[in-house]
UniProtKB/Swiss-Prot annotation:
Binds 1 [4Fe-4S] cluster per subunit. The cluster is coordinated with 3 cysteines and an exchangeable S-adenosyl-L-methionine. Gene3D superfamilies: 6.10.250.620, Radical SAM ThiC family, central domain. Belongs to the ThiC family. This is Phosphomethylpyrimidine synthase. It comes from Photorhabdus laumondii subsp. laumondii (strain DSM 15139 / CIP 105565 / TT01). Substrate binds at N253, M282, Y311, H347, S367, R368, G369, D408, G409, L410, R411, E447, Y474.
Amino acid sequence: MSHNTVIPTTDISPKPDPARPRKAQRDAAQEFINSIQGVTFPNSRRIYLQGSRDDIQVPMREIQLSPTLIGGTKEEPQYEENEAIPVYDTSGAYGDPDAKLDVHVGLTQLRQPWIDERQDTEPVAALSSDFTQQRLTDAGLDHLRFNHRPHPLKARKDKRVTQLHYARQGIITPEMEFIALRENMGRERIRGDVLRQQHPGQSFGAQLPENITPEFVRQEVAAGRAIIPANINHPESEPMIIGRNFLVKVNANIGNSSVTSSIEEEVEKLIWSTRWGADTVMDLSTGRYIHETREWILRNSPVPIGTVPIYQALEKVNGGAENLTWEIFRDTLLEQAEQGVDYFTIHAGVLLRYVPMTAKRLTGIVSRGGSIMAKWCLSHHQENFLYQHFREICEICAAYDVSLSLGDGLRPGSIQDANDEAQFAELHTLGELTKIAWEYDVQVMIEGPGHIPMQMIRRNMTEELEHCHEAPFYTLGPLTTDIAPGYDHFTSGIGAAMIGWFGCAMLCYVTPKEHLGLPNKDDVKQGLITYKIAAHAADLAKGHPGAQIRDNAMSKARFEFRWEDQFNLALDPDTARAYHDETLPQASGKIAHFCSMCGPKFCSMKISQEVRDYAAGMEQMSEAFRAHGSELYHSVEDVSHEQSA
């Protein structure tokens, strides 16, 4: 990677082209990340909500709106100002035009002072992973290496450094205060009654306070109902929370494979993901240079990063699942924990006795991690070594504050297999493992399916809450039908909105490439926009305080034909503007009181405004009628007297 480090207001990098040679694709990504600067969306500005201490500044995006025409004349129109709309922002420094960015140096270590002042960590005397030490001494990797790698920390002897530990001790950390400000979304800035109106929700038992306080955050984490993924070796991340009593979150998957992609392309996808609303990102790399790719991603990520460590462990044994050992896996956990991975997906619930339950399935075991562990169990006719060594896994996680995402290795891969014996047997085991992890103050969330028809979705949520003790649920979709390859972001978005409403805390996006290939950056955007819609729809249905503000602002702008405001309030302003301009590209189209769907004579909103004006005129006439005593006829003298007055 060459030096000098920009995300333009709109994407200027060449569109992915399957026919373009691999080197050209990589060069395009390199050009993109090496010309990066902080920008925000059209007519938006970066604001910071100030906490109780100088170094708690929570980034938000504020959408500036144009005023509403309320009367006057053509020469002297009268306007009423519209309030700016604050929205949750995951883009970190990449959304701040004043930020100094260089991917070769990495992001500012926001959380480092908070970690240091707790005085419960220390630098590792020597890197704990043999594999890491080998990589760092390999001169052949120098051209790929991130050169500003920090020295890793771990917990001091007999100390716990997890956010769950602090919460249980009654300690409100700066991370918790940061999150409380962030979850409230600056809605206290909104004064207008029209914008603040909201329908009551159906929360299915979720507790949604009108104002989220740092103490509420602490209580939810202490109870295990929420997690704060925040490895002490990823101080660049901005604190966020995953739990059903908070905003529904969205995860994006990136990662290279043995077939395609490069470090440059994955860093580009990371930045792209945070721009379009990824609350967390999972690096699912399975090809060469996994270690080096992950270092670049972590040092440049403002959001928590998750991984599936078994993927890299499998690479270390050249793809032979039967050759995996606990020692290799343990070394991989230490390697990733000291790099700064915030949460691990661990398939510890795939037990030997559950594997035969999948024999009668239509699609068998579709989870990569699940199939790897099933093959290992059958090859050795032994119990899953992740299950056998789970307490040791927890000890490692507790030393670095790595959260556990207990993987659903037996999730259904087709709607025919939904809600079967194998799926729920594993889920119940994940509940047992959750209690063990909590013994070590390790934060836990539970992964869920998968392919589930709509009428069977809610049972997944109720089973998880009951058997996994209300630990946060994190699902892939679920996909509600199997007939739409190329459109599985739609089929899964339906299920995601439903299960988010029922209480799922985080939704793992699905891209149009699901079941077809490795997603490029355009697919990442499509998947994220789809899932931001699903998450927001779930927040509205649950009745999350303030969730409807942006919808109300959009509806008001739509009724008043403020086209630019409509574009800017959209989740994807560029696409909204482009679709409008396909048929009305002229500047006059941005002030017209109609669009190309209905035209000027059939616009329902224009007609509705005319009806309102007519009704207002009728009301004035009615008032005048009542003022005259409700008499139909008046003497000429009375009328003449009024006219002269």
